[in-house]
Swiss-Prot record:
Compartment annotation: Cell membrane; Myelin membrane
Protein name: Myelin proteolipid protein
PROSITE patterns named in the record: MYELIN_PLP_1 (PS00575), MYELIN_PLP_2 (PS01004)
Transmembrane residue ranges: 10-36, 64-88, 152-177, 234-260
Gene: PLP1
Functional note: This is the major myelin protein from the central nervous system. It plays an important role in the formation or maintenance of the multilamellar structure of myelin.
Amino acid sequence: MGLLECCARCLVGAPFASLVATGLCFFGVALFCGCGHEALTGTEKLIETYFSKNYQDYEYLINVIHAFQYVIYGTASFFFLYGALLLAEGFYTTGAVRQIFGDYKTTICGKGLSATVTGGQKGRGSRGQHQAHSLERVCHCLGKWLGHPDKFVGITYALTVVWLLVFACSAVPVYIYFNTWTTCQSIAFPSKTSASIGSLCADARMYGVLPWNAFPGKVCGSNLLSICKTAEFQMTFHLFIAAFVGAAATLVSLLTFMIAATYNFAVLKLMGRGTKF
């Protein structure tokens, strides 16, 4: 069997939905975590520079920002690991379905992988046999866990609900920055509003970013317009938008994972039909 035919047979059983969802998950998490981390840093600098001169006013905010940044590190690590596990589950379940119902045949690729895991031909040294045995045990344990798609359905469902809340929360800073940017546009083009320029303000206290006793806590008029024109404000605003898009992409990937895992579970346990997920 040629290499091309071998690859073609392997692709027949590839879980394409899981492959797409994994790529989307990695992209979304990287975008959300990377841009979100830098956007929080930019917000901290903007608050320190323009909205409050007293460190005690924004000390709690800085602690919250730093805590969120540490959570971002953990989120990135978890999702990259869990995405890889879900992809492995997709391959495992697809192979199981096709083996059970005769749609998936063992190829030279599978035989070669099996030989690699089990140590190959005789004549290997004891060190090579020990390494192969250890790898075989790891694969066996992983295979036993991957053999329960219902677990992945439950975990992914719970994770999707949690991430839905994260997605909603990621829209809050976008809303705040958009309101500030809209106010700046009204200041830049006074003909669009009947209010005086001096009364148009961005109040960080109104959104709970700063306590009500913070001074000045808000910026108005031409001072606010000058802030909106800074590269720091523009960059932070766009970073929050990118983080929001990343959260949306991650949510879509989780929904795709959940649908694929649920469908595979139903096929294996109830329907008895093959699937390409």
